[in-house]
Swiss-Prot record:
Role of this protein: The RuvA-RuvB-RuvC complex processes Holliday junction (HJ) DNA during genetic recombination and DNA repair, while the RuvA-RuvB complex plays an important role in the rescue of blocked DNA replication forks via replication fork reversal (RFR). RuvA specifically binds to HJ cruciform DNA, conferring on it an open structure. The RuvB hexamer acts as an ATP-dependent pump, pulling dsDNA into and through the RuvAB complex. HJ branch migration allows RuvC to scan DNA until it finds its consensus sequence, where it cleaves and resolves the cruciform DNA.
Subunit record text: Homotetramer. Forms an RuvA(8)-RuvB(12)-Holliday junction (HJ) complex. HJ DNA is sandwiched between 2 RuvA tetramers; dsDNA enters through RuvA and exits via RuvB. An RuvB hexamer assembles on each DNA strand where it exits the tetramer. Each RuvB hexamer is contacted by two RuvA subunits (via domain III) on 2 adjacent RuvB subunits; this complex drives branch migration. In the full resolvosome a probable DNA-RuvA(4)-RuvB(12)-RuvC(2) complex forms which resolves the HJ.
Protein name according to UniProt: Holliday junction branch migration complex subunit RuvA
Stretch list, region Flexible linker: 142-146
Family, as annotated: Belongs to the RuvA family.
Gene symbol of the encoding locus: ruvA
Keyword Cytoplasm carried by entry: yes
Species per Swiss-Prot/TrEMBL record: Lactococcus lactis subsp. lactis (strain IL1403)
């Protein structure tokens, strides 16, 4: 198992990044790939979790140990796989997530892609009261560089890759387009806030 990788960030796609470590490119699924844009072609440290299945060996990456700890707790819940856990983390309001779990706010939890009422209830049952301030609260995302409409397009692609439907995204795209000068990460955060209302 790997704890983290140190290497050069060489590629960003809607669901993954590629880190070159000693000439080997590691494909790593992350919650918000475009949050890494400012670090393109630089040395980065990414915390990872490896999932081994019969048909695939996958790496999931995190900006810090707290985000990884949250991911591990989420995938421990029956009904939440790695992709759903990444989609939940991508919302970037981890304190709100923890509050929703502790307060049994099923309506809030079911707004995440791949989380139905049954899974939300299981999250509450398995995770309520198990979060502490050092392990999961206050997870910060990477700072991303400035961008224009390309950033909005990247954000929409990333949200679709996380499981949000095109019809949902169309409803908020006009509002997002009015917010100029945001990074992909900021567009994603705004989109998630709009969809959570």
């Amino acid at each position: 198992m790997f704890e983290y990788l140190n290497g050069k960030l060489v590629k960003i796609s809607p669901t993954n990044i590629v880190i070159d470590v000693a000439g080997i490119g590691y494909l790593i699924s992350v919650a918000n790939p475009y949050a890494w844009s400012a670090l393109m072609n630089t040395e980065v440290k990414i915390y990872v979790h490896q999932v081994i299945r019969e048909d695939a060996h996958s790496l999931y990456g995190f900006v810090n140990e707290a985000e990884k700890a949250l991911f591990l707790r989420l995938i421990s819940v029956s009904g939440i796989g790695p992709k759903s856990a990444l989609a939940i983390i991508a919302a970037a309001d981890n304190e709100g997530l923890i509050t929703a779990i502790d307060n049994s706010d099923i309506k809030y939890l079911t707004k995440f892609p791949g989380v139905g009422k049954k899974t939300a209830m299981q999250m509450v049952l398995d995770l309520a009261g198990k979060f502490d301030a050092t392990g999961t609260v206050g997870i910060s995302l990477l700072d991303a560089g400035p961008a224009g409409n390309l950033a909005l397009e990247e954000a929409i692609e990333a949200l679709q890759a996380l499981g949000y439907k095109a019809t949902e995204l169309k409803k908020i795209e006009k509002k997002l387009a009015q917010e100029t000068g945001l990074t992909s990460e900021e567009y994603i955060k705004s989109a998630l806030k709009l969809m959570m209302k």
